[in-house]
Amino acid sequence: HGRKAGVRVTFSPSPFYTPEVDEFCKKYVYQKTVDAMAAEGRPFKGIIFFGLMLTADGPKVLEYNARFGDPEAQVVLPRMENDIIEVMEACVDGKLDQIDLKFEDNAAVCVVLASDGYPVKYEKGIPIHGFENFKDKDGYYCFHAGTKFKDGEIVTNGGRVLGITAKGETLKEARKNAYAATEWISFANKYMRHDIGKAIDEA
């Protein structure tokens, strides 16, 4: 047990999201949600993030967000081959059925670098170093979250500071690459989880 906090590690594709889970969710979660909003006179057009937990009794919905998941999008979007602008325009125009979403045949893992003490009490305004290490590194990404530009440098400004994403041919390789890339960034109170995502090594 612990305090509720934002996601610290995420990966794509998920070996736990099986065809059976997908079929169940499409029938009883995704479509039901959209149909219910339309029936209430509030048809939804946009992004819905479904926060799911897999249980012995099947998938359970923990939360909805009317946006991409953070940091979930940081492993999904880098693998998407489509132009995201075209996808969003199709969404706005009601023509998503004409879009064939395609994803790279690889994997991506994102490790969140947090401020030590998060989600309770943590220091802000600490200089962050190492962004130059990501230059010209294909398949590696550094996504900003709790940061700001102050006095000519980038400093921490939140609990979840950066999302470090890396690709790999497999989830195991992507996880290894992502954790290696976390060492490229340094700030005084940097903290990250090492135990989350280990299940993908055996998946």
Give a label for each model feature:
Residues 24-32, 173-180:
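A non-catalytic, amphipathic alpha-helix used as a structural packing/dimerization or gating element
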Residues 26-48, 65-137, 150:
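Active-site "cap" helix and flanking loop/linker of ATP-utilizing ligase/carboxylase catalytic domains
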Residues 1-3, 50-54, 59-68, 146-147:
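Short beta-strand elements
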Residues 1-21, 71-76:
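Glycine-rich phosphate-binding loop of ATP-grasp-fold ATP-dependent ligases
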Residues 147-151, 155-203:
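Generic C-terminus detector
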Residues 59-60, 108-111, 139-141, 153, ...:
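Structural motif
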Residues 16-18, 68, 72, 165-171:
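A generic structural motif
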